[in-house]
Amino acid sequence: AKKMKMNRKLYYILHSGKNSKLRYYITSYLWISMPHCLLSWFRKTIISKAQHGNDWDEITKRVEYYNKLHRSEIDLPAFQQKAIKLSEQKKTGQSVYYLDAFRYAKSFPLHRKWWLQPGDVTWIPDIPAIVKSRPIKGNNANSVLLKLDRVRHFLFVNDRLKFTEKADKVVFRGLIGQFDSNTLKQNRYSFVKKFFGNPRFNIGVIDKGFNEWSTEKMTIREHLSYKFIMALEGNDVASNLKWIMSSNSIAVMPHPTYETWFMEGTLIPDYHYIEVKADYSDLEAKIDYYINHPDEAQSIINHAHEYVDRFRNPQRECIISMLVLDKYFRTTQ
C-alpha cells in the first residue's frame, strides 16, 4: 500500500496538468529585470496601438470593472501616508504577488505610490489597494483587481472528451481546513459531510486529519472524465473554476461571493455554470436535470467557452493590466 501511495504521488507530480512553476519564475524574473526605460517604451507603444484596435471597447469595459476608483471618494491623505513608492516595494512573502504586479508597475515612473495587498483578500481595504480578490457585494472600489497568482489561478485545458462521453457523476477534490488555523472551510466541509459515500459522487479530501474522507490528489485529466466538477470557494474564489469552464465538463457551485481577474461577479447562473443552493439541497435534482437534458448542458459548456475566450489573448491581458494601473496611479496621485 505504501509503494502504491508513493507511485501515486509520483504520478500526480508528473501529470498534475498544472502550469509549470519553473517556466513561470524564469519568465517573470526576466520580465522584471528589464530596464525601466524599455518597459516604459513598451507600455506606451502597446497602449497607443490598442486604442486603434477593434477590441478597445472590450478593453475599456474590463478596465472599468477591475478599477472602479473615483478620485472624489478616496481618502487621499490616508493613501499618501500608507502607500509606498514603487521604487521601495519589497518582495512579498509569496513572491508571485510581487512578480505578477511589478511586471506591469515597473513600466510606470518609480516615484508613483501604491499599496499592494498580497494573499487572499476577502475584505475591502480602507485605501485603494492592488489585490487578487475582493468581495462581490458592497462598495468594493478600493479593491483594484490585477491578475495575481496567475500561475495557480489561470490555467486552461484542451479537453479531448465530449460531455456525452463522460461519467454521469460529480467529482470533488480539495482542502476543507484552513492552512493557517484550525477552522474549517465550512461550505466545503458541509458538502463533503452531506455527499461523501454517495455513489453518484467521487469525493475526496486532501488534508491530513480527515482519515475517513482522505484520498490522494487527482490530476486535472482525471477530473475531466466526469460530467460535473464542484467549484467550491476556499479562502476566496474556487481556483479550479477557470480550467473547468475551459473544458467539456460543467462547473457546479453556489453563487460566488468573491471575484478575481476572472470577473466571477459577471457569471450568469445556469448559463455559464450550474448554480446550486448554498445548502446543496437541490444539487442532485439539478445534476439529474442536466444528465437528462444534454443539449442544455452543452449550451452551458459553449457559453463557458465563450466566456473563457475573453482571457486567452496574452497581449490584451497585458494592455488591460497596464491600463488598470494607469487609472490607479492617475486617480490616487
Each model region followed by its residue ranges:
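Charged, often glycine-rich, active-site loop that binds/positions anionic groups
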Residues: 129-134, 214-222
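Catalytic binding pocket for nucleotide-activated donors in carbohydrate/polymer assembly enzymes
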Residues: 221-333
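A generic local structural motif
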Residues: 156-158, 214-218, 238-239, 260
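Secretory-pathway glycan-assembly enzymes, especially type II membrane glycosyltransferases
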Residues: 2-209
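Extended, non-globular alpha-helical segments
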Residues: 194-219, 272-274, 278
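Active-site-adjacent structural elements in folded domains
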Residues: 155, 211-216, 269-271, 288-290
